């Protein structure tokens, strides 16, 4: 879980667009964020296994 101050700083508008970066919308994790869902890999897996992400299925081949 990201520190509260880091999340608040991330939410503020940036002076330059190039300084913006992705964070997970649930836990605030800055790494391994899937842009399409706005979630980190940990939260994505958790929600997908619970069936809360429509159209996402576990792969099997």
Curated annotation (Swiss-Prot):
Binds 1 zinc ion per subunit. It holds the Pfam family Ribosomal_S14. Its cofactor is Zn(2+). One of its GO terms (biological process) is translation. InterPro entries: Ribosomal_uS14 (IPR001209), Ribosomal_uS14_bact (IPR023053), Ribosomal_uS14_CS (IPR018271), Ribosomal_uS14_sf (IPR043140). Keywords: Metal-binding, Ribonucleoprotein, Ribosomal protein, RNA-binding, rRNA-binding, Zinc. One of its GO terms (cellular component) is small ribosomal subunit. The keyword Signal does not apply. It comes from the Bacteria. Zn(2+) binds at residues 24, 27, 40, 43. Belongs to the universal ribosomal protein uS14 family. Zinc-binding uS14 subfamily. Part of the 30S ribosomal subunit. Contacts proteins S3 and S10. PANTHER family: 30S RIBOSOMAL PROTEIN S14, SMALL RIBOSOMAL SUBUNIT PROTEIN US14M. HAMAP family: Ribosomal_uS14_2_B (MF_01364_B). This is Small ribosomal subunit protein uS14. The lineage of its organism: Bacteria, Thermotogati, Thermotogota, Thermotogae, Thermotogales.
